[in-house]
């Protein structure tokens, strides 16, 4: 674990736990070693740090490139191991970077809907299925609640579901990726019930 990451994780936990309360469910579903993708719903800018706090291992995030252009924030998220992705086009460089992260046996955090899905209308992209298929990484679905409308002593909850695998290698067809993506999102939103439907 990067020392700065460990410090930042502790600080975020302290703030979130104090102001809102923080609960984690299903941490036993997260493999502690090996290539891993954690795929989560996304409704708030608080989601990446809160997901990181709930995870029992360090998470490297793919983040939209615009964030890296913000002077202080861009430098901070680079220190935390994040790397940029251009959402306006097929970003081959970021895909190669993501596969490299997974080939090192580390954990990659992705929000399949490609950005904040506040009103529930965004359709999930097939990036998680593609990366999992090419790398052989395990995928753990996750659901975050309580970050959309935070107020003092409201509770933030992150739930981790049972891991799954998409194994087709270079032979994965678009239909396969679409099917796997649909199954992944079904599993992510099925976890909502555990949070109380928030």
Roles of regions detected by a PLM:
Residues 3-4, 93-198:
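Non-catalytic C-terminal accessory region of glycerolipid acyltransferases
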Residues 13-16, 189:
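Amphipathic, well-packed alpha-helical segments that form the structural scaffold of globular domains
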Residues 17-25:
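Short gly/ser/thr-rich secondary-structure transition/capping motifs
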């Amino acid at each position: 674990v990067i020392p700065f990451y460990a410090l930042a994780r502790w600080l975020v936990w302290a703030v979130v736990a104090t102001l809102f309360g923080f609960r984690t469910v299903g941490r036993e579903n997260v493999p502690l070693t090996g290539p891993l993708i954690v795929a989560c719903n996304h409704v708030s800018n608080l989601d990446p740090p809160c997901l990181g706090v709930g995870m029992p291992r360090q998470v490297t995030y793919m983040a939209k490139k615009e964030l890296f252009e913000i002077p202080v924030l861009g430098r901070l998220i680079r220190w935390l191991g994040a790397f940029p992705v251009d959402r306006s086009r097929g970003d081959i460089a970021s895909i190669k970077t993501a596969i490299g992260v997974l080939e090192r046996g580390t954990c990659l955090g992705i929000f399949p809907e490609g950005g904040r899905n506040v009103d529930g209308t965004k359709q999930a992209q097939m990036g998680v299925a593609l990366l999992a298929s090419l790398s052989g990484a395990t995928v753990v679905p996750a659901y975050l609640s309580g970050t959309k409308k935070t107020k003092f002593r409201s509770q933030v909850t992150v739930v981790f579901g049972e891991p799954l695998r998409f194994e087709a290698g270079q032979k994965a067809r678009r239909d396969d990726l679409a099917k796997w993506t649909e199954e992944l999102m079904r599993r992510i939103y099925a976890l909502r019930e555990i949070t109380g439907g928030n």
